[in-house]
Amino acid sequence: MKCVASKFNMWLHLGWLLGLLLVLLPLVRCQGWGEPRFETGNVENISLAAYNEAQLQQDVWMVEEMDAPFVLLYINYQGPSEPTIRESPADLDARLQLSEGGRWSIVINRRQDYEVHQRSSLILLAVESTAIPYAIVVNLVNVLDNAPVMTAQGSCEIEELRGDFVTDCLFNVYHADGFEENGIGNSSTNELSFEIGDVAGARDHFTYVPSTVTPSQPIYNKLFNLKVLKQLDYTENAIFNFITTVYDLDRTHSFKMSTIVQVRNVDSRPPIFSRPFTSERIMEKEPFYATVIAIDRDTGLNKPICYELTALVPEYQKYFEIGQTDGKLTVHPIDRDAEQNELYTFTIVAYKCHNRLLNTSSEGAIILLDKNDNIPEIYMKPLELEFWENTIMELPFDELVIHDRDLGENARYEVRLAETVAGVQQTTDSFTIIPGNGYQRVSFTININNATSLDYELPERQTFVLHVTAHEPIEPTHESTQPITIRLKNWNDEVPKFGRDEYQISVPETIGAGELLATVTVTDRDIDDGIRLFALGRLAESLSVTELPVSAEPETNLPLYGFEIATKVGDIFDYDIAKEVIVQLQAEDTLRTAKQESLHQIFSQLTITVIDVNNKPPQITLPRGTMHILENSVPDSAVIIGEEQIAQIIGTDPDTEAELEFSIDWSNSYGTKSGIRAKAETYENCFYIHEEKVNRQRTIGTIRVNPTFPLDVDHEMYDTLFLVIRLVDRNQTILPNTVETVVAIQIDDENDNAPYFDNSTLTVVRSVKERSDSGVTIGNIIAHDIDGPGNNEITFAMEPIDPAHKGWMNIDDNGIVRVEGNRSIDCDIPPIDKVLQNVTISDWKWSNWHVFEIVLMDTNNKQPYHDPFPNDGQVYQFEKIPSNTAIVRVEGKDQDRDVPYHTVSYEINYRDFPQLQRYFEVDSTGRVYVKENNDLLDRDAGLESIMINIVMLDNAGGYDIQNRVSTNINLTLLDINDHTPKLPELAADELKVSENAKQGYIVKTPFAALDLDDKRTPNAKINYYIEEMTPELETPLFSLENIDEYNAVLRVAQDLKGFYGTWTLKIKACDRGSEYEPIIPLTEEPKDNCETRDYELTVEPFNYNTPSITYPSRSAQLRLKYESLQNGRPLVETNGSPLPKFEAIDDDGGIYGDVTFSLTSTNDGEQDHEVFRVDKVDNKTGLLVLENSLAVQPFPKNYSITVIARDGGDRQSEAAIHVVFINMTGEPAFLEPTFDTDFTENEEGRDERRQLPFAEDPKNAGLPPGAETNVYYFIDKTYGNASHLFQLDRVSNVLQLAQLLDREEIPTHEIRIVATNNENGPPDTVLESSPSLLVVRIKVNDVNDNPPVFQQRLYAAGITTNDRVPKALFRVYAEDPDEDEIIRYELVNGTAVGENLQTDGLPFRLHPDSGELTLTSKVQPNQNGYYQLTLIAFDRDDTHNDTVPAKVYIVSESNRVTFVFLNSVEEIDQPDVRKFLAQELTGAYEMECNIDDIDQTTASDGRQAGGSSSALTDVRTHFIQDNQAVEASRIQQRSSNRTFVTVLKTTLRTRGLSLQDVPPLATEALTEADETLQIILIVVSAALAVLCVILFVAFFIKIRSLNRQLKALSATDFGSISSELNGKPTRNVPTTNIFSIEGSNPVLNDNEFRDRMGGSGGGVYDDLSLQSEESDFNDVDRDIFAPKRKESLNPALLEHIRQRSLNPMANGTDKSNDGAPTSNHKKLDETDDELSHRF
């Protein structure tokens, strides 16, 4: 307020005197003040409240962390007094300062921290009077200057398969600026936000939500729970490890924390088979074992797996078993042949043993392999056949089947037939069996294919045996044979007759086999007839009928057929069944007449009386019901059934003379007690059988107690006897004569034994705890009574020996001892160790007793305690107490009985006070001391005092209850100067300064070192120095100045332009510990502690630099595994290690050094980069991952991509790389399928080596040497026929010879190389298309090891006087099998044989290269004979040579024969063709033929006049016989034979030579003049002859034409024969088609046809006749000598002819287009008019 107003108010209210005093005071105080009294110069950070004049108080609010020094406020005072600060907090370091404008200001020299300093301070400012100061209240305003800190409250584990819920994973966020409402800058409440790093989809799965739990110090802490948004899957991610970034208000500060979330596996997935069973082929009738393994897909739980097997066909379940827990599959032996099945399918179900619903199944199958264990079995009905003799038929079998129950080749068999005739077995040609082989079960037929041998008149054929044999071709021992009896039938017409009507005999029932029963005779009047006798009825198969020799009946002399009837087998009669047996006898004759009558059959009977014989064993009949007897029964007591019925055992025998006797077989009898065998001596002979004989065939036996048995029948020894009862027939002579049976006899019990205690129950120790509850079981007492049920029921009673123990325990009827009184047992006061109890046992008849001890067990029911501590446990010590320093001793006590319970142990309560575990321990005596290797008790770390919680406990080492009592000790720590000031670890951003920074620019303020000592002492006050800067400069770039006792400011000392780079400042900070004076004496002298630290200050440049990619390098190839590719997952190199991160360097700072990677395709038009992406890892690295794994193609696909590294300033660099995905399972591959190389033949090639190309292993693509997977090379032995000639180093792939080569034998070889990773060799089979194969073509280099060889062994030629000089006579040719040989020819010598021949020099020259022999001088007419020459061919090095003779004959032209061929010179003039031609002509004419020359046929020869072909070649030859030239006439004479020439042509055509002619010998040469004249005469004669012929032909044709024209001009009657009109024409006439219709007018002119022709000219135009050129009216109006144009005629005459002529040609216009317009000729359509028909 203004001073005047204050004075006026005081005057009015307080009176004059008081008013005067008051007026004087304001006048003094208001003197020199302006309005407002206080103001701020920093309205953004400092605000002032309204001045309170009543209290002389000015409130000031300023934000924290303002750079000191700064002006707090200005004082608008200009008075005479000098303001002073009477009082101010040291933290403010407030000072008065006079500004340039003359105003006073209060300057704060220390930086203020809301979280450290006082939040409200008072400054007393004295202006006019020190007694009445102005109060300036300074309030700090909190600003957001601290980063949040996030910590996890324990581990985080979340169950899977549950979504959208809040977990119990708790996280605490601490913020030093707090969370008070409107507590930050008076503007807003601090708010937190979270960001989850998107690693493995964590951002989609989790979020943070506020927790309902209230944290400690909620102003600074907030708790958050992790919420699951999308359910987790343990199989996809068992652990999430992601970065959580927490931001405070407006994302001002952040904090990153690595968050680990463990997914808890939930039991929800079915098992999966890790070793399934699919199918197996096993041998039948053999067991098979396998193991099936399934694992829990919930791998975190790994629950046990159970197994179950179900056969698809329930009937086959019996063959399969599987272990429920071990998965052991057992297949029992299966008889495939019996089941007739090879495939057995089943399902194996694996399920979790605790939850059957979680299961998975797998289909399995067993395929049985057949075992060849069955032979072919023949099933045949009947086995005997009768059929008519000499008849083609199929044998009438009801069944003829062969069956082999095996499978496959084991079931194949072959069938053959044989026959036994007259006792001799032989192959048969009479029968055939169809088919001849079979498989498994096949029906067969047997046919007669040769009936001539089946002749009844042959005695051996009347009855014979046919054998059917089946055998397996693969196992000859598997064979079966079935004989068939074949009987041939004859015809008959007489009825046979028995000798008697009835036959009677008697036989014993035991008659044996082969015994004669009766002789039967039959007579038959047929001649050559026979009788067969049959025994009919049931015994027919058991009797044999034997035919006796045919004799004559004495009376009638008829054939008498006798038969003996005998037994086939023994024991066919049974007296007890039938005492008399009647057998029907049937006799049948066997002869049929041509009438085909039926066979005659007669009957008789044989009556057999059976005589009884004792031959049957006896039988035993047991009674119904249970047989039993009471134990201890008196002798002769009988075994009974039911209550009193005596058990009777009945023995019978059907034989009449039987003598039966019972007995007991004690050696096979036995007794049991409760199913256990009893000792034989306790029951043996205890019973005997009392017999009562009813008759000889029946005896009754009863089992009785044996009087001679020394013991009693005892139920306690055995409760059941199993007796073997034997019945014997003493009179039976035929064994067996006995029968046995087993009977069971129960031994009944009676109460004859007293109960007794079990031995073990007498020695067992029983105990009970004191204070046990009622009903607690102490133990049980076991007693036995060996009597049976009803006699062994035991009751128990118990009484304590000491009456004081009554009511503590009781016993029930089962012998169980329990606590009776509730918590009534006490063993502590007084101490009691055991209780004695007398237990009595009894049944209804007997009793027994025993005293038992029951031990009492002490319980820990007394609490430990201790005496009080002095000073209530308060202890003082200096901080950092040494180890083993004692703090206090605790003495505990306890009143329990047992030593463990009253022995007190000590421990520190680490559970509730985990901090104590770092510092203290307590020993068994209660001594509390500082532990060994303890954490320092550091007061400067905030531990000014600590409470030690000591726990006393008894029973420390036991497993029972422990009683715990705790007590506290309070320890106060005093400070020592044990900390060196820790210079701050400044972030790079804090030490970065722009290159444009100017002098005085503050780099860091405050620059504060941290000294953990007590800030209230000099131990924490710090001085700062810059000791050194590197690199060194004369003038320092930076300065460091203290701004208070704790902080300094780092400034730029000069402009930084041009000083870009990193500068290291060595800064030293020292505390003032030497000034420290503690309350208690220190153990050491105080001193100052100093620390020096290097700081790197970065002077940030402008963005002058471009990022440089360090990985991958340019043109690098990244080799990645093709297996298990997933989108977004790290890629793996072929060596199994993860692909390194992409990295680039950029020396620029900030965003200019923040590099981001991107990709593009290197090649235009390709999209290789779309398969990948680069995930950013940090500012210099990125991770290459897949964007689309399904589109990835393996090697040889090469992804060409360009990696782009771009910094924040849009500068970028690129690196083109290649990415290949290697299939690590691929085989090596050659780049080319073939390779050519060479080796030298002979010894020269033995030491040669050839490096073959290496195979490219896809697994080695791009690998450096030494890192590749080894590739081995082998020669494929199965390829070609040259592999044995070579050997190959399998590692180096170097090829060398195994055998020497011969190029002349084989010039090239071909082998195949197989590349593989298997060092033991290639696989057995390799696909022909496999790239692992390399075909090596080997050329054999030649060595000059062969001489040249002439193609011919003799060369010959002929020369004449007409031969030109020089003339090539012939060309020699030598071949050298060596390669690239150069042959040199040489004429070495020669001789002349004949007359007048040169002897001094031969007239020949041999070209050394071409081998051509040339005539060098002309042959003289007086020379004759021949030259004998020797020619030599040398090879390149003159190492080898060959010699051949040559002859040159001097012949005349009459000796030369020219053969003309339809071939070119090049086709014939070849050495081999010349040789062939000379040989063939020599052989054909039987004279030596020599070819003189070969030349093209010239036109002057006259043979080309026809111009048929230009490829005619003359081969001039001469023939030599006896060294003399043969006249050509002889050759031409021979050539006149057409057959000879045809054969010769055919022979020559085999080499493509077409012989055309053998010209005759040319006449002798004429003189030149004669020759010219002759030619002229011939030409003139020929011309005259041609003219005569032309004239004759012309006149003949003209006359004929005129005759036709005259005849055509004459008119004939229409329809007459001569007109040939209206009838069938016989010649082509132009008007034939026009006037062929009756009624047409033949006399027409062109006017009538003008309209038809569509123009002004012409009439009917018969183009058909005209085109045929066969019309008789052609050229009828033309002059013979005129040209063929109508214009040549006189126009008047032409018009006259047109008007009168019938010839349409005359009426038509001229068709010539020679200079005239083309006539508009049109062919008439057939439908235009009936006159237009043409044929």
Curated annotation (Swiss-Prot):
Region of interest: CR11-MPED, increases toxicity of activated Cry4B toxin, peptide alone is not toxic: 1358-1569
Chain segments carrying region Disordered: 1701-1735
Motif (Toxin-binding receptor motif 1) on chain: 1344-1350
Topological domain ranges for the Cytoplasmic compartment: 1596-1735
Any single GO CC term annotated in Swiss-Prot or TrEMBL for this entry: apical plasma membrane
Compositionally biased spans, kind Basic and acidic residues: 1722-1735
Compositionally skewed regions (Polar residues) per UniProt: 1701-1719
Transmembrane segments: 1575-1595
Membrane protein topology class: Single-pass type I membrane protein
Signal peptide: 1-30
Subcellular location: Apical cell membrane; Cell projection, Microvillus membrane
GO terms assigned for molecular function: calcium ion binding
Extracellular side: 31-1574
The entry's keywords: Calcium, Cell adhesion, Cell membrane, Cell projection, Membrane, Repeat, Signal, Transmembrane, Transmembrane helix
InterPro entries (UniProt xref): Cadherin-like_dom, Cadherin-like_sf, Cadherin_CS
Function noted in UniProt: Cadherins are calcium-dependent cell adhesion proteins. They preferentially interact with themselves in a homophilic manner in connecting cells. (Microbial infection) Binds to and is probably the functional receptor for B.thuringiensis subsp. israelensis (Bti) insecticidal toxin Cry4B. Trichoplusia ni insect cells stably transfected with this protein become suspectible to Cry4B; cells undergo oncosis, they bleb and ruffle after 20-40 minutes, swell after 40-60 minutes and lyse after 90 minutes. Following toxin treatment in the T.in insect system levels of intracellular 3',5'-cyclic AMP (cAMP) rise 12.5-fold; EDTA but not EGTA pretreatment prevents cAMP increase. Inorganic phosphate also rises 3.4-fold after toxin treatment.
PANTHER family assigned to the protein according to its UniProt record, in alphabetical order: CADHERIN-RELATED FAMILY MEMBER 2, FAT ATYPICAL CADHERIN-RELATED
Domain notes from UniProt: Three calcium ions are usually bound at the interface of each cadherin domain and strengthen the connections, imparting a strong curvature to the full-length ectodomain.
Identification of the protein by name: Cadherin-AgCad1
Organism name: Anopheles gambiae (African malaria mosquito)
Name of the gene encoding the protein in the UniProt record: Cad1
